[in-house]
Amino acid sequence: MKDPLLKKGSFLSITLLILSGELIFLLPYVLPRVFRPTFLEVFNLNNLQLGSLFSVYGTMALLSYVYGGVISDRFQPKKLIAVSLFFTALGGVVLAGYPSYFILKILYGYWGFTTVFLFWGAMIKATRVWGGSKNQGKAFAFLDGGRGLVAASMGSLGVLIFSAFLTHDIESANLIERKEAFRYVILFSSFMVFLTGFLVLFFMEKDQKDELKKTNSLNSYSNIKTVLKIQSVWLIMIIIISAYMGYKVTDIYSLYASEVMLFDHIQTANIGSLQLYLRPLVCVIIALIADKTSYIYFIIIGFITM
């Protein structure tokens, strides 16, 4: 069988996977990460309330992860990914209206469903097929490294949009002016998510029939039970959870820059976006090396570094 890496148009497919893989999280995660002080101010939130929103998101996402994998076994990834992007973008329209805290909790629960249930399993499966049997490390390196580049680029672009629509200097701009400028950032982000969904739906290649077969849903549920009995699966879970705990710590960099270093909102947003540029560089370099050596070694080094 011909390796999917070598098939015509595979570069377009991985590019769309990279775009969708990061833009799907742009509204619920990247904007609060890059614009943390601004996000708290314009939505009149404190850190506990924002953390509660993420908890609502995480709870819904956890349930979606469990059942979403079954859905990805039965439908073409491109359709699942596109639908997820469309519904996620609609949530951005609600966010741009500056809803109440109660509505924000509903919105984050909604995003926990739209960004994971139909999306995550489909993206992982499509990436695995793209990489073939001998290039899994490269495939996921390009995916995660590319996602990091997209996040950094969108963060920087968001900062430019925010500063461009401020009618006064950031220090003299009042809350209403900041909210209006940030609204454009939200709407632009929503448009980019929707546009990516359109591109995925019409331009991403279909997976080969013999590589992605539709499976009976009952068999899929049975497979979940079987997989959970494998010890290495639980070790992988621990690795992923621990890695994300370390990753989430970096979310407060922009808030630290604002409250401790006394940077203004534009400068703190720049701090939040600039840190994202390290992600693509490290991901690609490590994964290219990991394909030729033991990946366990790099996991150990990573945790020691953190």
What is each residue range found by the language model?
Residues 13-45, 68, 154, 249-254:
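Extracytoplasmic
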Residues 32-36, 147, 151-159, 231-273:
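Extracytoplasmic gate region of multi-pass secondary transporters
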Residues 64-76, 281-295:
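Helix-to-loop junctions at the C-terminal end of transmembrane segments
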Residues 74-85, 291-303:
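Cytoplasmic membrane-interface "Motif A"-like loop-to-helix N-cap segments
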Residues 86-100, 304-306:
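C-terminal ends and interior cores of transmembrane alpha-helices
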Residues 108-146:
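Cytoplasmic helix-loop-helix junction between adjacent transmembrane helices
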Residues 180-202:
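Symmetry-related core transmembrane helices of the 12-TM Major Facilitator Superfamily/SLC fold
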Residues 201-222:
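Flexible cytoplasmic inter-helical loops of multi-pass small-molecule transporters
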